[in-house]
Swiss-Prot record:
Pfam families reported for this sequence: Queuosine_synth
Domain of life (superkingdom): Bacteria
Function: Transfers and isomerizes the ribose moiety from AdoMet to the 7-aminomethyl group of 7-deazaguanine (preQ1-tRNA) to give epoxyqueuosine (oQ-tRNA).
Keywords: Cytoplasm, Queuosine biosynthesis, S-adenosyl-L-methionine, Transferase
GN (gene name): queA
Protein name stated in the entry: S-adenosylmethionine:tRNA ribosyltransferase-isomerase
A molecular function GO annotation: S-adenosylmethionine:tRNA ribosyltransferase-isomerase activity
Catalytic activity: 7-aminomethyl-7-carbaguanosine(34) in tRNA + S-adenosyl-L-methionine = epoxyqueuosine(34) in tRNA + adenine + L-methionine + 2 H(+)
Family: Belongs to the QueA family.
Organism, as annotated: Nitrosococcus oceani (strain ATCC 19707 / BCRC 17464 / JCM 30415 / NCIMB 11848 / C-107)
Subunit structure: Monomer.
Pathway membership: tRNA modification; tRNA-queuosine biosynthesis
Broad class of enzyme this protein falls into: transferase
UniProt GO BP: queuosine biosynthetic process; tRNA wobble guanine modification
Amino acid sequence: MQLSDFTYNLPKQLIAQYPPKRRGESRLLSLEGASGIVKDRQFIELPELLSTKDLLIFNNTKVIPARIQGTKDSGGKIEILIERFLDQHRALAHIRANNPPRAGRRLVMEQSVEVEVKGRVKELFELRFLDPRPLPQLLEAIGQMPLPPYIQRKTVPVDKERYQTIYASRPGAVAAPTAGLHFDKPLLKRLQAQGIRSGYITLHVGAGTFQPVRVKNITQHQMHSEYVEVSEQICAQIRDTQQAGGRVVAVGTTTVRALEAASAKGVIAPYQGETEIFIFPGHRFHTVNALITNFHLPETTLLMLVCAFAGSEHVLAAYRHAIKKGYRFFSYGDAMFITEAKTG
């Protein structure tokens, strides 16, 4: 299976650089995975695509202001992107600098916060923050929201609110589970009033979500690791939904990865820990029946997951339709509602 199987040409002007004025004002392209039929909709029409037997599952991870600017003790500029917390004062991080710092060096960040480089763990640096404030509190004071590289502008105040779901409650992500950005309080109330149930998993999205696939044969790609929690409570909700003949509707590819990691033995079970699950065409889905997701970059593992779910031919045809119709792409862009292409 070749990387070139997952490419498409996207006009640059369709890459959304800002969110819509209000949540939920996005467009929604529905795709029947079994037939390939697409229909142009608005995201506020989502309740019409769901039944009272269905279960919506959200990722409640919270994006941390993980990007910090500073200088090395030599005076050179440096940028830190936190990947994950180790404890209240230590973290693993990516560092961008002309010459990466060695173990034992001190960095001076915003508000004169000092950071000690403890060593390296593969491509990441282990850092110790020499500040009495716990890291989550410290980052709120000195950090910036880590916008994706294809949003080619500086962070603005609105990003702190809009690059975050309204139900985010578990700090730890360095990228938003973007399918959830479309949901506002009125829509959640409509879904609840319609009798559609919901639940939550946690997957802390890492910077690896933007990691390019560097091999021509995608089966040789090494997937990045992310932390997942799937509780017994959500497992029970899923079992009840399946027994009642309802659909498990994942809000976002991160939710799909969490649920499929927790279903590795064929049935859903509680899961807590790391996952490196790589979902590409040929994967048999055990838990997820429908997917709400944004449009994804060409040749990425996210697009491969969507192609696994609804079939590459149908997905890429839907993308061509979306481009022709002027849909907005990527994190701040429009969304899709996709039903599974049954493979028997």
